[in-house]
Amino acid sequence: MSQPAGGRRKPRTLGPPVCSIRPFKSSEQYLEAMKEDLAEWLRDLYGLDIDAANFLQVLETGLVLCQHANVVTDAALAFLAEAPAQAQKIPMPRVGVSCNGAAQPGTFQARDNVSNFIQWCRKEMGIQEVLMFETEDLVLRKNVKNVVLCLLELGRRAWRFGVAAPTLVQLEEEIEEEVRRELALPPPDPSPPAPPRRQPCHFRNLDQMVQSLVSHCTCPVQFSMVKVSEGKYRVGDSNTLIFIRILRNHVMVRVGGGWDTLGHYLDKHDPCRCTSLSHKPGSFLKPPAPPVQHEVRVQDGPSQTQPTMTISRSQSPPPPVDWKTYTSSDRRLRPPTPSSPRPRRERGAGTGASREMAPFLRCQERSLIPSWRQPTAGDSPPSPQSSSTQKGRDPQCTSSGKREERYPPELPRGRIPTSWVHEETDSWGTDAGNPTPQRLRAIEATTKGISARGPSPLPRSFGPAECLGLRLPLRDEAKGAFFQFREPESVRSPTPVQGLTKIPIRLPPARPPTPGRSFPGATSGSPRTELGRDPIPLRAVTVDLAGSTHGDCSVEVRQEDQQLDIQVMAEARESWDLGLQEQEGRYTPLPLGGNKEQAIYCSLEEEILGNMKLLEVRSACPQGTRSGVIPRSGVYIPRLAGQWPEPGGPYDKAIQELAQGSPSLLKVDLEAWKAAPTGSPKPAVTPGPGSLKGKLGARQSGPRTKASLSAKGTHMRKVPPQGGQDCSASTVSASPEAPTPSPLDPNSDKAKACLSKGRRTLRKPKRVPSIYKLKLRPRIRPRRDHRPEKQPSRIPRPLAYVFLGPARQPPKDRLLRAVLGSKGGEASRVDGASVGEEEEEGKEEKEPAAPLESSPQPPEGLQPHWLNQAPLPPEEESWV
C-alpha cells in the first residue's frame, strides 16, 4: 500500500533545521486525522481514555499494542476454526505476544514490549517493511507517521478475521465496493465480513467543503475539480478520479492505498501552489485548454507593424506592467508631449535647428540598452527618456559631396548630433570650405536654446577621447570661428556671469582616457552665445589648464601651432576610425609613424604641463575658499574667488622649476626615523628643482594624497647629525606642535618613554620577538610528573633552599651591562655619542615591539639595582 508523499521525517537535531522541498503547512493534517480515527477505534475496543493528544503517550509502554496483538491472534484462530478453507488464502497469526505488564514509560521493559509487537507484525501478520516502524520511532517520537500507518494496516488486515476496524478502513471498503459495481468486477475471495452498520456520510455538505477548499486559489483559471458523482471528482486536466469522504472535521481523499486531506492534496498537485514538475501528472494528459491571455498592442509608428505582447495567466499572475513607463526595444523618437520632459537638443531650438535635425531624427532610434556598446565606468545607466542609439549605419552627406558611413554614436541629452559637425569639414580639415550662414544660424539658435534654460544637472562624465567639442572663444580674433579639435572642451559664454555651456560631440574613442581629465560643465543663468557672421579659416585650439582661476579649463588659441595641430587632428581622426574598426573585429591596428608618435608625445607633454600647473593652483588655494560641491565627474577644481590671477604669480615659478631640470632624489632610511630634540635646528626638506619627469611621478602618486597631506599638517623634516654621527634621517611627525624634551632635561628618560608611544605607531618593526625573550613575565615551567609511568618524577627544590645556598656571582656580561648603563646615563648628559646612548639605542632596536605598559622604565638612579634583580637562571628558578 503506497501512501501520500512526505517521506520518513528525520529526528530533530541541533543546528540548522532541515527544510523540506515542499514546506506545506498542511503536511501534518492527514496524520492528525488518522490519529483521531485510531484513538477512537482503540477507545471503542478496550475502553481506554485515549484521544489524538495523548495517543502516543498511551502506546509508548507497549501494553496496549501487545494486548491488541493477542486479541487479533485469538480472532484469527477462531476464524481458522470456523472457515479453514478461507483461512488458507490469507496470512494468519498463530502465536501471540509476550508482554511485561509492569513496564513504565521510557524503561527497557517498555522497549521490550514494543519490540515484541514489531516482531509479531513482521512474522505473524506479514506487514510490509515500508509500513513498519522501529522502537525509537514510538518511544522517542522519531517517526510518528509509520506508527500510524502500521496500526492502520493492522486494523485493515484484522478486519478480515472479524475484528472491528477503524473508520478509514470501513470507508475504503465502501469505495472498493462502489468501484466493483461500476466495473462489474467479481467479489473478492474470500469475501470480507459484512461491515458494521454505521451512520452514512453526509454528501450534502461534502460538495460545499470541496468548493471552499478549491476557492483558495486566486488564479483566473482555477484548478478544476469536476464532480462526477457523490464523493467522486475528476481533477485537473487528466482523467484522474479521486474519492472524497468526510471524516469528522476533515475532508479526506483516497489516494492510492492510503488517505490524505484535500488541502494537502491540492498543495501538492495544484499548479498554482506547487511549481515542481515532479508532482504533476506526466501521463494520460489530454491537450491543455488555451489559457487566459491578455493581448496588448504597442504601435511604434504609422508605417510599422504592430508588435503584440501576450501575457499568459495559466499558472500565476505576472507582476503588473506600468504602461506609462513601458517602452519597446525598437520604439522611435517621438515629438515630446507637454507633460513629458523634452530632450535637450529639441528645447529652445529655432527653425534652422529643426531643419538640420530633421534628417538626423529620421535615422535615430531609441532603445533601452544598446546592444553594440558595453557601458564604461563613467557611464550612467541609460533611461528610456535619455538614451538613444543609431541603429545600422546610415550614410551621411559631407560638404565635399562624398558619402561616408557614420558609426553609431550614443547621444545622450544635451549633446549635438555628429551629423551637424561633420558637414563643416571632411576628414578633419580636408575640406577648406567656409561654413555657410544657414549652418551658423542653426547652431547659434540651438546654442541659445540650450543655454537659455538656466541651471541644469551636471552631464555624464566621459573620457577625453570619447567626444569632440565645439568652442566659441572669448577673444575678438576668434569670434565667429567654428572649431573642431581632438580634446573635449567647453563653450565659454561672453557674459560676466561665471559659467560654461558644454556642447560635446561624441566620436569613437582612440585611446584610454587620462585620469582626472573630464571637465564638468555648468550652465549660466542667461548666457548669450553669439557667432560672428564673418567666417575665418580653421585654427587649432589647445588646452591651457593654468589659465583658469575658476577651475574651468579655458582654451587658448595658438596661431603658431596651427598647421601642426591640423595634422595631428587629422591623424587622430584616422586613429579613431581604426580603433572602432578594431573593436568591431574587422581590421588590425596599424603601427604608428614617426610624425604621429612625435605629435602624440607633444600632446601628452602639453597635457601633463597643464595638469601640473593646475595642481600648483590647487595647493596654493586656501582650504576655506573651496566649494563643498564636487561635480559628478570626480574632478575637484578649486575656484579662487572668481578672479583671474595676476601675471607673474605661481605659474611663472612653476615654469621656472620645470625648466631647471630633474630634482635630486632623497633616499629615505626607515631605520633612522627617530624624533629629533627641539633644541637642535630642523631645516625642512624642500624638493629640488623639479622637472617634467619628477612632476609626473608626483602626479602618478595622486594629487589627492598630496592635498590631504598638506591639509593634515604632516611635515617631512631632516634631522641633523648628532654626536659625530654621519647618518641623517628624515622623520615624519604627526603632531609637530607637541613639545620635545631636550637632552639636558633630567626627566629625559620619562619623556622618551612618553614620546615613544607616538613613535611606535609610525614605525613597523621588521620582526616581532617572542614575549618570553623580552622577559616581561616570569618563566613558568610546566610540570613534568603528569605521566609517572614514563619517567620518574622530580621533587621541586624549595625556595628557602635556593636563597640559603651559596651566593653565586652574577655573570660578567650582566655586571658589564649594569656598569655601562649607569655610566652611560651620566655620560649621555655630557656627550651625545657616549657608550650608554649607544647601548640604549641598541636595546631599542633589539626590542622594538615591547609594550611600554608591560615593561616600565626604571629610574636612572635605580637602574643598576634593577638590572641585578633580573630573573634567575633556569637552574635556580622555582617550580610552580
Curated annotation (Swiss-Prot):
InterPro entries: CH_dom, CH_dom_sf, GAR_dom, GAR_dom_sf. Keywords: Cell membrane, Cell projection, Ciliopathy, Cytoplasm, Cytoskeleton, Membrane, Primary ciliary dyskinesia. Residues 201-273 form the GAR domain. Residues 180-200, 283-360, 372-437, 489-533, 676-880 are annotated as: Disordered. Expressed in bronchial and nasal epithelial cells (at protein level). Expressed in brain, kidney, lung, testis, fallopian tubes, and skeletal muscle. Expressed at low levels in stomach and colon. Residues 301-315, 725-734 have a biased composition (Polar residues). This is GAS2-like protein 2. It comes from Homo sapiens.
